Curated annotation (Swiss-Prot):
InterPro entries: DNA_helicase_Holl-junc_RuvA_I, Hlx-hairpin-Hlx_DNA-bd_motif, NA-bd_OB-fold, RuvA, RuvA_2-like, RuvA_C, RuvA_C_sf. It comes from Aromatoleum aromaticum (strain DSM 19018 / LMG 30748 / EbN1). Residues 1-64 are annotated as: Domain I. Coiled coil: none annotated. Its main location: cytoplasm. The keyword Cell membrane does not apply. Residues 144-152 are annotated as: Flexible linker. Residues 152-199 are annotated as: Domain III. This is Holliday junction branch migration complex subunit RuvA. Gene3D superfamilies: 5' to 3' exonuclease, C-terminal subdomain, DNA helicase RuvA subunit, C-terminal domain, Nucleic acid-binding proteins. The RuvA-RuvB-RuvC complex processes Holliday junction (HJ) DNA during genetic recombination and DNA repair, while the RuvA-RuvB complex plays an important role in the rescue of blocked DNA replication forks via replication fork reversal (RFR). RuvA specifically binds to HJ cruciform DNA, conferring on it an open structure. The RuvB hexamer acts as an ATP-dependent pump, pulling dsDNA into and through the RuvAB complex. HJ branch migration allows RuvC to scan DNA until it finds its consensus sequence, where it cleaves and resolves the cruciform DNA.
Amino acid sequence: MIGRITGILLEKNPPQIVVDTHGVGYEIDVPMSTFYGLPATGESLSLFTHLAIREDGHFLYGFASADERAAFRQLLKVSGIGARTALSVLSGLSVSDLAQAVALQETGRLVKIPGIGKKTAERLLLELRDKLGRALPGFGASTVPGAAAQPADSRSDILNALLALGYSDKEAQSALKAIPPETGVSDGIRQALKLLSKA
């Protein structure tokens, strides 16, 4: 199991990044919450990782904190929740917001996330109840130092990130129009997610 990766950030194409470690480029899918805090390409970073081995390949997922990875692993244990949906949940909610939603059994926050319907939200909350807190003994700690988000004037990155999260092209384009042109990619994705969650 690959539990941690430290290297140079080569590419950022949300939700996937490429990290070079001793000459090997690892493709890693990350939630938008982690993507927001990535350094600029060419700079070093360290991520907590989860390796999934399936018949169609090996897939690596990266997280800024151990808590985020623990939440991801708990989400994967919920019936009907795959890695893509788990990443969407962590892109739409912080770990603390997810824990709060689980504690209060709030389906409202979850159904705003692409790929999560009411029944899935109810099942997720039910199955995670009493589990999430135990899975996060160091809740709120263990964040990897990684640097602040860097500005990037690529509207296509914002659009691609929204499409990768499951939003339709129409929804993504609509949110994109409401964001000022000079907005950086990380801030743009964050603003778009807020706009879409209110829709």
